[in-house]
Design a protein with these regions (language model features):
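An N-terminal assembly and electron-transfer interface module characteristic of large anaerobic redox
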Residues: 1-489
Length: 489
């Protein structure tokens, strides 16, 4: 970079303030943005994590389930620490600690010994196995390894041991979540479908959602409806259990019996279609009842769609309590719309979150001006463009598929916005641009208790409106001249 500006490459302690300022000004320029967007072989700070992280999240969503990493200990520590830092809760998982000999001779012995130790020490009801890079590169055969482990008595013959291939060098955390969830459901429901039997329940798949409050909100809404519910991969208690003097490795999770019987449910609804395409495709071919795929219910319109579909599936009237809740959400939007109207936002994150952010912002009269997804698809781009085209506030907004947070920095420095929505990794770009960052995504490392507030449903609307508008008002109070510092806003 220094060479491109005609500067001598020096140690930072030898660099003058003038030279530093020259580089800073250049990386904020249109010229640099063009070069930044021209790069192809390099990714800088992508807005996603790796497959095994999502696989571990899915495993935590089931009762008595021990996540088991077939791979190196260091990889397992990364997945655990990332979840721990986001939720500020333990994220128990084990690893068979493959090293150099496993890389040469294969990891079967590591897996067998690890499974035997896990059963003896942690006494799980189910072990969910997923892989890191090393066993994927050498081609370890998990089907054969686990079959051999059963035949040799390393794990009880009746203990479910679903597994997923989750190479870190391909896909993202949402793909790992999808693969692990699919494997768990295939394993638990095998041979459990009964002709003519119907549990009368709604099976709900929330997608790769890292907000525990969202799961509780789904359960509360269905309780208002009087609809019996099975949440497939329920992390609400796994990562938000009470501090009451006791600790369990296996707090919460969907009961295995309920998950096994979910194949006989009345209907199955996925609210994270971009996070669970393989799982939902298999469910449509194998599960009884009706199958519905809807966007994550962020904002009024998407929440309405979920509410009306549940009412249709179960032939129920929408409860008055939910109608009142909707009215309060609309009232909150009306009270606050003048503080968001016309504001420009840069948004980034997982596909399902992006659809939700964009829908919500358009409803508030704001502009989702720059939309960045690090692993997007043509289908996602088409859906987002449809949302933009359907609103006057989408005019001039642009979608950037398969771009990273360094691309996003160039965008907000050359074409400024009023705020960003995403996760903690965007704080550096937000600081450089001098704008607020609203941490509604994953991971959130630098704020506390964010996962305890819903983003979905009518309550989610009220929460996001409140957070965003009050921050704008705070900023106005902090930066205005004394003569404009008023009691009323």
């Amino acid at each position: 970079m220094a060479n491109l500006l005609g500067l001598e490459v020096k140690k930072i302690v030898e660099t003058t303030p003038e030279e530093i300022e020259k580089v800073q000004n250049w990386i904020n320029s249109e010229e640099y943005k063009e070069q930044n967007f021209a790069r192809q072989a390099l990714v800088i700070n992508p807005a996603h994590a790796c497959q095994p992280l999502g696989a571990q999240l899915a495993a935590h969503g089931f009762e008595g389930t021990l996540p088991f990493v077939h791979g190196s200990q260091g990889c397992a520590s990364y997945y655990r620490s990332t979840l721990n830092r986001h939720f500020r809760e333990p994220a128990p998982a084990v690893s068979d600690a493959m090293t150099e000999d496993g890389a040469v001779f294969g990891g079967q012995n590591n897996l067998h010994e690890g499974l035997e130790n896990a059963v003896a020490l942690y006494k799980p009801k189910m072990i969910a196995v997923f892989t890191s890079c090393m066993p994927e590169v050498i081609g370890d055969d998990l089907t054969a390894f686990i079959k051999n482990a059963r035949s040799k008595g390393h794990v009880p013959k009746d203990m479910p041991v679903p597994f997923a291939n989750t190479p870190s060098f391909n896909g993202t955390h949402i793909h790992g979540y999808d693969s692990m969830l699919l494997s768990i459901l295939q394993n638990l429901t095998e041979g459990k479908q009964v002709e003519g039997r119907c549990t009368g329940k709604l099976n709900l798949i929330a997608g790769c959602d890292f907000n525990t409050a969202d799961y509780r909100e789904y359960k509360r809404i269905m309780k208002e409806f009087g609809v019996p519910l099975t949440v497939l991969a329920d992390i609400s208690d796994s990562f938000d259990s009470p501090c009451n003097g006791t600790y369990s490795i296996y707090a919460g999770g969907t009961p295995l019996e309920d998950a096994s019987d979910s194949i006989n449910g009345k209907a199955t609804m996925t609210l994270g279609p971009y996070a669970t395409p393989k799982t939902f495709g298999w469910i449509k071919d194998n599960y009884a009842g009706k199958h519905v795929s809807l966007p994550m219910p962020m904002g009024i319109e998407k929440t309405d769609a979920m509410i009306m579909k549940v009412a249709e599936l179960f032939c129920k009237e929408v409860p008055q309590s939910l109608k009142d809740e909707r009215g309060r959400a609309v009232d909150a939007m009306t009270d606050a719309q003048q503080y968001m109207h016309g504001k420009k936002f840069a948004v980034y994150g997982d596909p399902d979150y992006l659809v939700g952010y964009v829908s919500f912002l358009l409803e508030m009269g704001a502009h989702p001006y720059q939309i960045v997804c690090s692993r997007g698809s043509k289908k996602l781009e088409k859906e987002l463009q449809g949302l933009l085209d359907g609103s006057m506030y989408g005019k001039g907004c642009k979608i950037y598929m398969n771009k990273d947070l360094w691309h996003l920095r160039s965008l907000i420095m050359t074409d400024p916005v009023d705020a960003m929505i995403g996760d903690s990794h965007g704080k550096f770009a937000a600081r450089d641009a001098g704008i607020p960052l609203f941490r509604f995504g994953f991971p959130v490392f630098d704020r506390v208790n964010m996962h305890r507030y819903p983003r979905i449903g009518y309550q989610g609307v009220i929460y996001m409106v409140t957070q965003i508008c009050n921050k704008f008002l705070d900023s106005k109070d902090e930066t205005c001249e004394d003569r404009f510092f008023e009691l009323m806003r």
